[in-house]
Amino acid sequence: MKILVDENMPYARELFSRLGEVKAVPGRPIPVEELNHADALMVRSVTKVNESLLSGTPINFVGTATAGTDHVDEAWLKQAGIGFSAAPGCNAIAVVEYVFSALLMLAERDGFSLRDRTIGIVGVGNVGSRLQTRLEALGIRTLLCDPPRAARGDEGDFRTLDELVQEADVLTFHTPLYKDGPYKTLHLADETLIRRLKPGAILINACRGPVVDNAALLARLNAGQPLSVVLDVWEGEPDLNVALLEAVDIGTSHIAGYTLEGKARGTTQVFEAYSAFIGREQRVALETLLPAPEFGRITLHGPLDQPTLKRLAHLVYDVRRDDAPLRKVAGIPGEFDKLRKNYLERREWSSLYVMCDDETAAALLCKLGFNAVHHPAH
């Protein structure tokens, strides 16, 4: 059995070699000749999987180590009798921590408290729901918009997008990309919505580039209306609008979900799915794969306030480390993908062991995903 894996999928070689022969290949473009001699294909979001890629090949299973699946023609795979698995939620924590890193940076720069802001979350799936939980743990007001969930009668106080635009100081998008249909998200943030955002609002897109109309966003920024913007995703990736990048506060190369933990979760989820597909079910404990974090443990004295949370969060991951490299190479062909391929190791908050002498601080840090313990001062 031969399994093709994207060369940038961590732990793929060591896991899939338990099941058969493994060949690591580039994800964009996939070498077509390799597909004619393989049984399974494991990809990331850079690989478009459809009839033109796989028709006439012996591939009988496709796994994507990503939560999103808009790069995969699932209907055709089903019709062709090809097994498929994605990794829902694998990088949700990473995206939440990216959003926090950006918000804490903007709050410090502009001198505001997040507790005085209302945060509108558009799309309340794996990412949006975790973001809401952490924000509410900090006492920050959230408004939720998720029409498909509201229509299903899911529990939650779901508002309309209109209400969020009127009330929210921060609007953050965490939807899939649907190009048509009743819940179309293509240009969900269109010219009208962007024009109606409150002066001084913050717009964050860390889901899929075309959810926000990039031309309309640039027009508003060029008009000089106060708006802070954080973009991790762009229309037309890997090409992006360089003028828009120059106008936003934080711009990164579609890496919000790129923690070591998130990538490892993605790989293990598709590995477990494929092992079950071939009747050799296996489970993998994530901690057996991950290396020891850079920071062993730190000690925190006193309560947890916003500046302290910012220091802890940025000790693990400061979003600015990914903003500067993109600005340096923007517009140079191939560089966007190179930043993703050669991405510096990044960990999640859970990798930081925090000893607190304040019991409330320890409990709150645990709710936020840190590995915190109460250790009374003697």
UniProtKB/Swiss-Prot annotation:
Binding site for NAD(+): 146, 175, 232, 257
GO BP term (any one): pyridoxine biosynthetic process
UniProt cross-references to Gene3D superfamilies, sorted A to Z: 3.30.1370.170, NAD(P)-binding Rossmann-like Domain
InterPro entries: D-isomer_2_OHA_DH_cat_dom, D-isomer_DH_CS, D-isomer_DH_CS1, D-isomer_DH_NAD-bd, Erythronate-4-P_DHase, Erythronate-4-P_DHase_dimer, NAD(P)-bd_dom_sf, PdxB_dimer_sf
Gene Ontology cellular-component annotations: cytosol
HAMAP family: PdxB
Active site residues according to the UniProt entry: 208, 237, 254
Protein source organism: Salmonella typhimurium (strain LT2 / SGSC1412 / ATCC 700720)
Intracellular or extracellular location(s): Cytoplasm
Highest classification ranks of the organism: Bacteria, Pseudomonadati, Pseudomonadota, Gammaproteobacteria, Enterobacterales
Residues noted as binding substrate in the record, renumbered to the chain: 45, 66, 258
Catalytic activity: 4-phospho-D-erythronate + NAD(+) = (R)-3-hydroxy-2-oxo-4-phosphooxybutanoate + NADH + H(+)
Family named by the database record: Belongs to the D-isomer specific 2-hydroxyacid dehydrogenase family. PdxB subfamily.
Quaternary structure and interacting proteins, as annotated: Homodimer.
Pfam family name, one: DUF3410
Descriptive protein name: Erythronate-4-phosphate dehydrogenase
Pathway in which this enzyme or protein is active: Cofactor biosynthesis; pyridoxine 5'-phosphate biosynthesis; pyridoxine 5'-phosphate from D-erythrose 4-phosphate: step 2/5
Protein role: Catalyzes the oxidation of erythronate-4-phosphate to 3-hydroxy-2-oxo-4-phosphonooxybutanoate.
The organism's place on the tree of life at top rank: Bacteria
Keywords from the UniProt entry: Cytoplasm, NAD, Oxidoreductase, Pyridoxine biosynthesis
Main location per the UniProt record: cytoplasm
GO molecular function: 4-phosphoerythronate dehydrogenase activity; NAD binding; protein dimerization activity
